[in-house]
Amino acid sequence: MEKSGKSYADALKEAQQKGYAETNPTADVSGSDAEAKLLLLSAVGFGLQLQPGTTWRKGIGDIHAVDFRYAGRTGSSTIKHLAVAKRVGQAVEVFVSPALIARENFLAGIDGATNAICFKAKKSGGSRIERDCDYVLVGPGAGGGPTAVAVLGDVCELARGEGRFAGLPSLVPEGALKLQPAEEITGSFYVRFIVKDRAGIVGDIGQTFGHLAVNISEIWQLRHSAEELRALAESYSLKENPNEILPFVITLERATLRQVLEALDSIRHRDYIVVDPVWFPIWGTK
């Protein structure tokens, strides 16, 4: 989508043809497959025994080509689907979501069917790759070949009676850390709006966030050609005249997910909103 400008539907179809996504792509695009893997890593790294559906999970279905254009407006950022488990004091933030990520971040360069695991270890003595990353494991994560090799390897281990499937020991005693409630996860956020083109909208949105003590960091508004607006309207099956809609993005200073969602729940019902706002975290901000 980023490089070709393809719609989500066309990009998904191509991924299915290449074997990167299942015929039923729900687990791939909803983030549930990534969540399952993240829960295993959270158990090993933090001693958390979590069930699917107990964490904040956001898929990629809301992402459109226009979001990549805004992300790359200065060539400085892109969008990646991240699965994150991060210790904050005696709690652990666990979530799966698309995220705005700086181009200079190592994970921004992971493309196609390649997967990467980036982790930070206290007093690791390793070579720091990123501020939040001491070590990286990179390899193919989708497609017939990698999947077949992984499955065959598991079958061979079972046949030999090896005990890898008995479970991995946790690095942290079970129960020592707790799951951070999703609504208390804190960060900066990207929010993309498509509204009716009229005056006063940004002020109203800013006031709504302000009432919840959330500050707007930046407002991005690009020039869109008639062709871009028409394609955007078609992708959402909008009835509005494409020349009368206005996409724009705001970024928010650090806030809790509860604050952000409360504001958006109010804004989405305003008469100037054409489609529900699209939002996701900005990764790597302090």
Walk through the language-model features, giving the residues of each.
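A conserved regulatory-domain signal marking ACT and ACT-like small-molecule sensing domains
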Residues: 150, 155-286
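Residues in well-ordered beta-strands of folded domains
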Residues: 56, 80-85, 95-99, 118-120, ...
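A generic structural signal for short, solvent-exposed coil/turn residues
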Residues: 73, 88, 111, 129, ...
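Substrate-binding/catalytic subdomain of NAD(P)-dependent oxidoreductase enzymes
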Residues: 1-2, 6-109, 113-116, 143
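Catalytic, metal-anchored helix/loop core of enzyme active sites in primary metabolism
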Residues: 14, 19-23, 93-196, 201-207
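Intrinsically disordered, low-complexity coil segments
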Residues: 75-77, 86-91, 122-135, 223-246
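Short secondary-structure transition/capping segments
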Residues: 7-8, 12, 63, 68-78, ...
